[in-house]
Amino acid sequence: GVPCLCDSDGPRPRGNTLSGILWFYPSGCPSGWHNCKAHGPNIGWCCKK
């Protein structure tokens, strides 16, 4: 997946570690991950639990 910003990473993408990944739905996030931000019907922002 493509790196994305999780809520726990901080307010801005720049200067922060991007610990999330963009994941295509509707298959859901990988095991051990959860959708931390809604990003349309076909893409989820998945972050580690």
UniProtKB/Swiss-Prot annotation:
Biological process per Gene Ontology, one example term: regulation of signal transduction
Consequence when changing residue 48 to Q: Minor effect on toxicity
Site note Important for sodium channel affinity, residues: 13
Site (Important for channel affinity (interacts with rat Nav1.5 channel residue Asp-1612)): 37
Site (described: Important for high affinity to sodium channel): 18
Entry keyword set: Cardiotoxin, Disulfide bond, Ion channel impairing toxin, Nematocyst, Neurotoxin, Secreted, Toxin, Voltage-gated sodium channel impairing toxin
Outcome of substituting residue 7 to K: Incorrect folding
Annotated phenotype, changing residue 34 to A: Minor decrease in affinity
UniProt effect for mutating residue 33 to A: No mutant obtained
Effect of residue 10 to A: Decrease in affinity for both cardiac (Nav1.5) (15-fold) and neuronal (450-fold) channels, as well as a 30-fold increase in discrimination for Nav1.5. Decrease in affinity for cardiac (Nav1.5) (600-fold). Not correctly folded
Effect of substituting residue 39 to A: No change in activity
Effect of residue 15 to A: Decrease in affinity for both cardiac (Nav1.5) (13-fold) and neuronal (600-fold) channels, as well as a 50-fold increase in discrimination for Nav1.5. Decrease in affinity for cardiac (Nav1.5) (600-fold)
Matching Pfam families: Toxin_4
Result of altering residue 16 to A: Decrease in affinity for cardiac (Nav1.5) (8-fold) channels
Name of the protein described by the UniProt record: Delta-actitoxin-Axm1b
